[in-house]
Amino acid sequence: MGKKYTESVKLVDKNTLYTVQEAIELVTKTSKAKFDETVELAVRLGVDPRHADQQVRGAVVLPHGTGKTVRVLVFAKGDKVNEAQEAGADFVGAEELVEKIQKENWFDFDVVVATPDMMGVVGRLGRVLGPKGLMPNPKSGTVTFDVAKAIADIKAGKVEYRVDKTAIIHVPIGKASFGEGKLSDNFHVLMEAVVKAKPAAAKGQYIKSVAISSTMGPGIKINPGKVLE
């Protein structure tokens, strides 16, 4: 891997701010691993995440998905159980799933959806789901009675974005095998969503820096002033 990484690094100039198109072209060239690498976007924002009014979070359906099979766990009861199963949920349940997670440390799922009437039950898992970014949230559309739509969106390639403590958002935008066109489409849809999510309390330059990289490849910096072009 060392040799391949060294070759990849030579293709990228650390001091250059590339256009989106140049960066995406480079990321496909620097993806040299034997597996289909994930391409990740990192955006540093001009917000202070310590303040509640400067949080940036949301969700968006990427036009070409992420290339990843997403396992969905749904907390529901009554007729919502059937609705979730028919919509393609991988796991559906209530109290018994809470116990399974608590007792067996079971996490064979990627996204959790819950109906609002189940949040009292799901709340008991806050300490284990929260740190993993798995807690259902109305802002990201994962606390809803419309479980069929929530599942369909997730399976279609919906990704959540959320600013971390260092004011950076990390989101996958697809696989290296997608090629430049699909990665570019996904990049622009995601960046537009992040720009629209700018909090009113955020002052000064909002998009501070942008970079993309493949799983094993080097970071490629993008000119933050040209991300929507």
Curated annotation (Swiss-Prot):
What Gene Ontology terms describe where this protein resides (cellular component)?
A: large ribosomal subunit
Keywords on record: Repressor, Ribonucleoprotein, Ribosomal protein, RNA-binding, rRNA-binding, Translation regulation, tRNA-binding
InterPro entries for the chain: Ribosom_uL1_bac-type (IPR005878), Ribosomal_uL1 (IPR002143), Ribosomal_uL1-like (IPR023674), Ribosomal_uL1/biogenesis (IPR028364), Ribosomal_uL1_3-a/b-sand (IPR016095), Ribosomal_uL1_CS (IPR023673)
A GO molecular function for this record?
tRNA binding
Q: Does the keyword Lyase apply?
A: no
Please verify whether the record's keywords include tRNA-binding: yes
Q: Which GO terms describe its biological process?
A: regulation of translation; translation
What the entry lists under Gene3D superfamilies is as follows: 3.30.190.20, 3.40.50.790
Q: Which domain of life is it from?
A: Bacteria
- The residue stretches assigned to a coiled coil in this entry are none
Pfam family, any one: Ribosomal_L1
Signal peptide extent:
none
Chain's role: Binds directly to 23S rRNA. The L1 stalk is quite mobile in the ribosome, and is involved in E site tRNA release.
> What's this protein's family per the entry?
Belongs to the universal ribosomal protein uL1 family.
State whether it acts alone or in a complex, and with which partners, per the record: Part of the 50S ribosomal subunit.
Name this protein carries in UniProt: Large ribosomal subunit protein uL1
**Which source organism?**
Clostridium botulinum (strain 657 / Type Ba4)
Lineage at the top is: Bacteria, Bacillati, Bacillota, Clostridia, Eubacteriales
